[in-house]
C-alpha cells in the first residue's frame, strides 16, 4: 500500500552557488559523511554540485512523501547511496519509524536541473 509520494526539482547552479558561498557549513548541515566523501571525488565543483543537487532533491522528495518534517527527521538523517549497479537507495538513520516500509527512489538530471521521486510503501493494510 502506498503511504506517501514526493517529488522535487533542484536548480543545480543554485547548489553550486551555495556550495561556493558556504562550503563545509552547507555540506555538514545537509549531507552525511559518506555523501560528502563521495562528492569530493568529483574533479570539478560543477560535477560535485550535480551529485549534491540530486541528493538534495531526494531528501526533499522523501520529506514531502512523509508529509513534512513532523517526524523529527532532519536532512542529515537521510542518506542517499547507490548500489553496485547504480540504483539509488534512501536510508534514514531513525529507521525505527520505517521498519515496515519500503522506500522507492528515482533520481535524474538534465541540463541545469536535478529531480527526485520517492514512493513510501507499507506491507501493512
Swiss-Prot record:
- A Pfam short name: ACPS
Q: Which UniProt keywords apply?
A: Cytoplasm, Fatty acid biosynthesis, Fatty acid metabolism, Lipid biosynthesis, Lipid metabolism, Magnesium, Metal-binding, Transferase
Cofactor names: Mg(2+)
Question: Where would you say this protein principally sits, based on its record?
Answer: cytoplasm
Location of this chain's protein in the cell: Cytoplasm
Q: Which GO terms describe its molecular function?
A: holo-[acyl-carrier-protein] synthase activity; magnesium ion binding
Q: Tell me the domain of life.
A: Bacteria
Segment forming the signal sequence: none
- The EC number(s) given in the record are 2.7.8.7
- What reactions does this protein catalyze? apo-[ACP] + CoA = holo-[ACP] + adenosine 3',5'-bisphosphate + H(+)
Residue positions annotated to bind Mg(2+) are 8, 60
Query: Carries keyword Transcription?
Result: no
Give the UniProt record's GO annotations in the biological process aspect.
fatty acid biosynthetic process
Entry's InterPro entries? 4-PPantetheinyl_Trfase_dom, 4-PPantetheinyl_Trfase_dom_sf, ACPS, Ppantetheine-prot_Trfase_dom
Q: Name one GO cellular component term.
A: cytoplasm
Family stated for the protein in its record: Belongs to the P-Pant transferase superfamily. AcpS family.
Q: What does this protein do?
A: Transfers the 4'-phosphopantetheine moiety from coenzyme A to a Ser of acyl-carrier-protein.
HAMAP family this protein is in? AcpS
Name this polypeptide is given: Holo-[acyl-carrier-protein] synthase
Name the source organism.
Wolbachia sp. subsp. Brugia malayi (strain TRS)
Amino acid at each position: 500500500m502506498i503511504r506517501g509520494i514526493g517529488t522535487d526539482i533542484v536548480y543545480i547552479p543554485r547548489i553550486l552557488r551555495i556550495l561556493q558561498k558556504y562550503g563545509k557549513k552547507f555540506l555538514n548541515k545537509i549531507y552525511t559523511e559518506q555523501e560528502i566523501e563521495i562528492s569530493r571525488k568529483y574533479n570539478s565543483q560543477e560535477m560535485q554540485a550535480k551529485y549534491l543537487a540530486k541528493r538534495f532533491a531526494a531528501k526533499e522528495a522523501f520529506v514531502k512523501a512523509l508529509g513534512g518534517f513532523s517526524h523529527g527527521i532532519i536532512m542529515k538523517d537521510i542518506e542517499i547511496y547507490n548500489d553496485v549497479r547504480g540504483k539509488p537507495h534512501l536510508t534514514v538513520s531513525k529507521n525505527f519509524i520505517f521498519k515496515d516500509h519500503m522506500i522507492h527512489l528515482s533520481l535524474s538530471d538534465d541540463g541545469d536541473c536535478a529531480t527526485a521521486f520517492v514512493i513510501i510503501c507499507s506491507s501493512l493494510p
